[in-house]
Amino acid sequence: MDVIKRFMLFDKTILVSVISAKELVDKAIKIHSLSRTAAAALGRTLIVGAYMGTELKDDKQKLSITINGGGPLGRIVVLSDYGAKVRGYVENPAVELPLNGKGKLDVGGGVGKNGYISVIKDLGLKEPYSGRCPIVDGEIANDFAYYFTVSEQQPSAVALGVLAADNECVSAGGIIVNALPGA
């Protein structure tokens, strides 16, 4: 069962969110026939989208995430709404790259490093909030840590992981640590 748990630490100056998303990523793999590299990239982005969706306040609010790093996977787009209902796609779902020098999936090579992350939040105001920042390394976790710190002024550490086999998700989840005001 997928779940997001949040914990306040150190006199409520640190928020830790732990996300389990195996079912979400497994469904995406099956719907889009994702390669392992595409599954890792889209899965990591879906996890962040679900996390960000939990911050929306009512069912009229929604957000979109676009990652465009110029890599062979193409754009990654994720939509989330109130209650962390999330969906997304990757432009080139069949792209599979050789393992990187550490023996891991080369998500950074698939996403690319020449581009940006864009987040648009429709909070029901006159104009949607739009944040954009450059991609750091294409591995998605570091890119969102940078995005949260620079664009949302919330210093963060982000760890995301997707373990994908042929046409299935073995495990998927993340940990997001945010420094709150006064930390």
Functional labels for PLM-detected ranges:
Residues 2-183:
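Interaction interfaces in information-processing and related assembly proteins
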